[in-house]
Amino acid sequence: MARFAAADGITHVVCTPHANGQYEFQPWLIAEKIADLQRLLETEKIALKLGHGCDFHLSYENIQEAKSAPSRFSINGHGYLLVEIPDYGLPPGLTDIFYQLQMVGLTPILTHPERNPTLQADQPRMMEWLRRGVLVQVTAGSVMGRMGKQAERMAHALLANRWVHFLATDAHNVTSRAPKMRDAFELVAKKYGPDYARLLCVSNPLAAFMGNPLPPQIEPLRLYEDSEEKSWWARLTRR
C-alpha cells in the first residue's frame, strides 16, 4: 500500500485504525508499529511520511475518554479528530456531541458523510455543524463514482457548495480500496478549480497533519443567508 500511495503522488498518510470497541485501540502500540513501518519505508526509499489517528466512533466510552484525554484519538495528538458516523442513521444528539468535543480543544472532521443514507436524503442537516466549525472529509472513491451513485451525487453536491475541507483515500488494500488520490484531485481541479483541489488534497491535510490552523478557505455557498453572516465567515477563515 505504501508503494501504491507514493507512486500516486501521496506524501503523507495518517494511519487510522478503528476505535469502535470491536478492535483493541492502544495508541502506544499503534505508535510503535508506525515507527517500525516508517523505518522500513526509509530503508526501502519509499518517500512517505506516516502519522497516526483513528476512525473515532461515537460510543459513550470514546466520547468520555476523548474529553478527558483529547490527544488520545486525534491526528498526531494535535487536535483534529476523524469522526466516523454509522453506515445508517445518525447518533442522537450529534450536534451536542460535536460541541462537547470542541469544548476540550478538538476539531471534529466528519468523515465520508456522502456515504450515509440519512444525510444523502437530508444534506441541509449538515449546515449547522459546518456553521459551528465542524470540518468535512469526502472519500476520493465517492468523487470518482466508486462508492455508488448516491454517494457520488452527494460528494459533488458538497464540493459544489465548497462544504468539503479534505479528500481522503479511505484505503484498506491495493485492490478494491487502494490508496489513490490523483484521479480525484484532477477531477476536482477540473470541475471546481485548482485552488480548491489543492486546499482539499494538499494544504488542509498538511495543516491537520502538523496540527496547524487551516489556511484561508474558499467561502462556502448556501450556508449563510445574509451578508452579515457571510462577512463573519470571511473574518473567521482569514484569521
Question: Predicted segments — roles?
Answer:
Residues 6, 102, 159-160:
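Non-catalytic positions within long, well-ordered alpha-helices that form the structural scaffold/packing
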Residues 11-17, 51-53:
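Short beta-strand segments at enzyme active-site cores
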Residues 16-18, 163-179:
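Short acidic/histidine-rich active-site segments
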Residues 20-23, 57-59, 115-119, 143-146, ...:
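Active-site environment of divalent metal-dependent phosphoester hydrolases
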Residues 25-137, 220-239:
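Extended substrate/RNA-proximal surfaces in nucleic-acid metabolism proteins
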Residues 27, 120-127, 147-156, 160-161, ...:
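Histidine/acidic-residue-rich catalytic or RNA/ligand-binding cores of hydrolases
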Residues 138-140, 155-169:
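Conserved short secondary-structure transition element at the edge of the structured enzyme core
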Residues 186-239:
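Mid-to-C-terminal alpha-helical segments outside catalytic/metal-binding sites
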